[in-house]
Regions:
Chain B
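Short, intrinsically disordered C-terminal tails of secreted or membrane-associated proteins
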Residues: 351-354
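C-terminal catalytic domains of large/alpha subunits in multi-subunit enzymes
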Residues: 1-14, 56-331
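Conserved strand-to-helix beginnings and helix N-cap segments that scaffold or border functional pockets
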Residues: 51-52
Length: 456, 355
């Protein structure tokens, strides 16, 4: 059931639109429901090679030696790729927006920093032969102590996860975390009737697309290479691949646009650079596709977060101060997590006007699968923590949870903690509409409030 | 066995776009000889319906029907740059680029039509049905098909347009965090109703009732599709999903959908939704990005409803039956105690050892 509440903001909308504001059937839906949509994997190329990865069985280990000789003897195995074959082996995805340092190898060579990290690519005439080749690659490891807890990782003496950072956290312009400072939280806590501090925690979450991440790269004429990919961002993939391959940009072409579920999981650039490289070195089409197990345990999940929220609230329901310490578990490499951590900081203290806000958001490296973008990146888990905290605060002071939200909700013209004036607010109206929809009564004072005026 | 019901709510907002790195997207539009309009992009449709909404935005701006617009996308040899489909940016950023391109194409279209009709271009309008007519005297009109033919074969004009939307990069101030991380914000509020089995700790979500403020719903059924799909994901995050069930312990990671749990059709609640539209000044026809937000408010609403039902706070995701049951048992021992169930040392050792 869906209903439009046209009574809200009725003077803000222009009429006379004919093509937007009306339902049109999705252009791809018939193909999807009849199974006729062509995804990248539906393309077939003569001479296709299959790429399978040798992956780390350890969370953290030094690589003592890699022996591929027995793999090369497996019938159907055409060649193997190691770090030595990758022109610019160390990269980071967000170097395109000047995020530093490059901190991740395309293929691991001196160390592995998480279980499942890719080390050797095996190219073969069939998937079966490629997997048989993978089983024959001998890697000798020396296991190293690993760290899995974000707060343990920040302590002195913790195992160092990523040497390119030199410490277990991302550095933001000289700071060990992304900070937000607005007002004075100590004064806010002193003036509050109640102060509570609570801790929230999430675990990594998989995007779980129907179609796993993958691509096929095909050598064209004229030394160009076309990559058929299910990436969510063609140019991100093209530009990063060219940098990793040390290739002129014009030699690479990305074709995509039909994706069997993204949710942020196909924003990383993992399968394409190595498939490009394999196609360049073999002059044959190459397919690199994650298995379901790789999709779940090797491809980046949503970051686990640990969030401490300390609030000072007055008896009348106003939140006077909010202090947030947030830890994003980036896993072994940056990928998109430094960005998501900043996004998390900007999101605090939620859609409420609080005069005193103090936020420290830490992007922390641990020996687990690198986390990266996922739907609601930097916000979803923060909202879980904030809104459970809001429920606790409302109950603590004996206020209705809806009225408590409406009282504190930001209004047009208010100043946010990241010093941006609120514009186009509509939280008050959403809470009011939800109270109607769910038959959850609120008092007349709160019914009369709006996002444009604090009181009615 | 007792089943207890509870109700909880949560309200959230969500930013459109990701301009902490600069946030551009481009569109090119041209008319064919027969008056169809091709929009060329390199943007990716993830299955959310981007291509359909982009065609609608182009059609509305040009004043033609959506059927006459063809979206040609996702080839870097032909399509101009797009940052990508993420950060709830597609509708807003690419939509704005298309409006800019369509305005330029439309101005050429009207200029050619003006020559054909021997009137001033400023006096012309599209009728939305494939014709261009003189304002106030609709009998004086010309089919867009004929305008396009004339442009190609008689006037030597390209009916085309270029569009870009760029939200310039914001650099956060290191000391204070002063920044402009996004553009407009969408809003939501969800009320969840749950039933908790006090013997097994299992939670059944009975209903999710939500209000969403989306700026402008450009395609109402696709908005509905987004918000129900998103609410499903929120429910799934709240109660089921993780790749590391005993985080931060790395053991017992699922590798397939037998082990990685998600709600099935029988676990779906009743969905009721209300849409509110407060158009964004910078959005295409006022639209805001809502793709990501729709998963967010159900999660805390469900957590709060569980507390309302059985008095147990589970402050760690996912809220599994095991955690709920432990909370219920702890409460039975000490009803005065208000205890978050999660303890990291506990999760790391005892729970993992038990399995």
């Amino acid at each position: 059931m869906i209903e439009y509440r046209k009574d809200y903001f009725s003077d803000a909308r222009t009429d006379g639109l004919t093509e937007v504001g009306v339902t049109r059937q999705r252009s791809d839906v018939l193909g999807h429901v009849t199974g006729k949509t062509q995804y990248y994997a539906d393309r077939h190329f003569a001479g296709l090679l299959h790429l399978k990865m040798v992956r780390s069985p350890h969370h953290h280990a030094r690589i003592k030696s890699i022996d591929v000789s027995r793999a090369l003897k497996v019938p159907g195995v055409v060649r193997v790729l190691t770090a030595k074959d990758v022109p610019q082996n160390i990269y980071t995805i967000l170097c395109l927006i000047q995020v530093e340092p490059n901190d991740e190898p395309v293929l691991a060579f001196d160390k592995v920093r998480f279980k499942g990290e890719q080390i050797v690519a095996v190219l073969a005439e069939s998937e079966q032969a490629a997997l048989a080749g993978v089983a024959k690659v001998k890697v000798v490891y020396e296991e190293l102590p690993a760290v899995f807890d974000v707060e343990e990782a920040l302590k002195p003496g913790a195992p160092l996860v990523n040497e390119y950072h030199g410490r277990n956290w991302f550095t933001y312009e000289g700071h060990h975390c992304r900070r937000v400072r607005f007002g004075n939280v100590d004064e806010g806590f002193a003036a509050a009737d109640h102060v509570i501090e609570e801790m929230y925690q999430s675990s990594p979450i998989e995007h779980a697309p129907t179609e796993t991440t993958g691509c096929i790269v095909v050598p064209d004429q004229n030394e160009r290479y076309t990559c058929y990919s299910n990436t969510q961002a063609l140019y991100f993939t093209l530009d990063n691949s060219a940098l990793i391959l040390n290739s002129p940009f014009h030699k690479l072409r990305l074709v995509g646009g039909t994706v069997g579920g993204g949710f942020g999981g196909k924003v990383d650039v993992i399968t394409e650079p190595i498939a490009f490289l394999a196609a360049m070195l073999t002059r044959r089409p190459v397919k690199y596709e994650y298995s379901r197990a790789e999709e779940m345990q090797v491809s980046s999940p949503r970051a686990a977060e640990r969030i401490y929220i300390k609030d000072g609230v007055a008896k009348d329901g106003r939140i006077l101060a909010r202090q947030v310490r947030l830890y994003v578990d980036a896993g072994a490499y940056s990928r998109h997590s430094p960005y998501g951590t900043t996004k998390a900081a900007a999101h605090m203290p939620g859609p409420y006007t609080i005069p005193n806000v103090w936020v420290d958001c830490h992007c922390v490296y641990t020996n687990r699968t690198p986390s990266s973008a996922m739907r609601g990146f930097g916000v979803t888990i923060g909202d879980f923590a904030l809104e459970v905290q809001m429920d606790k605060l409302a109950r603590l002071i004996g206020m209705d949870p809806m009225e408590f939200r409406i009282l504190n909700a930001y209004r047009d013209g208010d100043m946010k903690a990241h010093q941006k004036e609120v514009d186009g607010a509509a939280l008050v109206e959403c809470v009011q509409a939800a109270s109607d929809l769910a038959n959850w009564p609120i008092a007349g004072r709160y019914r009369a409030m709006s996002s444009q005026k604090r009181e009615g | 066995m007792t089943k207890k019901r509870g109700r909880g709510m949560a309200s959230v907002n969500y930013p459109t776009g990701m301009n902490l790195g600069g946030d551009p997207s481009q569109a090119l539009i041209h008319a064919t000889t027969t008056g169809s309009f091709i929009v060329t992009l390199s943007s990716v449709d993830l299955g959310q319906g981007l291509k359909t909404v982009m065609a609608q935005i182009c059609a509305e701006t040009l004043g033609v029907s959506t059927e006459n617009v063809i979206i040609d996308t996702a080839d870097t040899d032909t399509g101009p740059h797009c940052m990508g489909t993420f950060a709830s940016r597609g509708t807003h950023r690419i939509g704005n680029a298309i409006i800019m391109a369509a305005k330029e194409a439309k101005s050429v279209l009207l200029e050619v039509a003006a020559e054909e009709l021997e009137v001033d271009a400023g006096d012309l309008e599209t009728d939305g049905a494939g014709n261009i007519r003189v304002k106030g005297s609709p009998q004086k009109s010309i089919a867009i098909l004929n305008v396009a033919l004339a442009a190609h074969f008689k006037h030597g004009r390209t009916i085309s347009g270029r569009g870009i939307f760029l939200q310039p990069r914001s650099y956060p101030e290191p000391e204070t965090g002063k920044m402009t991380p996004a553009t407009c914000y969408a809003h939501a509020c969800t009320v969840a109703e749950v039933e908790v089995d006090t013997e097994t700790g299992e939670v059944q979500v009975l209903s999710l009732k939500s209000a969403y403020e989306v700026g402008r719903a450009l395609n109402p059924r696709m908005v509905e599709q987004q918000i129900i799909g998103g609410a499903w994901m929120g429910l799934s995050h709240a109660l089921y999903e993780t790749t590391e069930p005993y985080y931060p312990n790395r053991a017992h990671g699922p590798t397939d959908f037998n082990q990685y749990l998600m709600p099935g059709p029988g676990d779906l609640p009743e969905f009721s939704n209300v849409i509110i539209e407060r158009p964004a000044g910078d959005g295409p026809f006022g639209a805001k990005g809502v793709g990501e937000m729709t998963a967010n408010s159900p999660i805390p609403a469900i957590a709060n409803a569980i507390f309302d039902a059985v008095g147990v706070r589970v402050d760690s995701l996912p809220i599994t039956p095991e955690k709920v049951l432990r909370g219920i048992q702890a409460l039975a021992h000490d009803p005065e105690k208000w205890t978050p169930v999660f303890r990291k040392d506990h999760a790391q050792t005892e729970d993992a050892a038990r399995h």
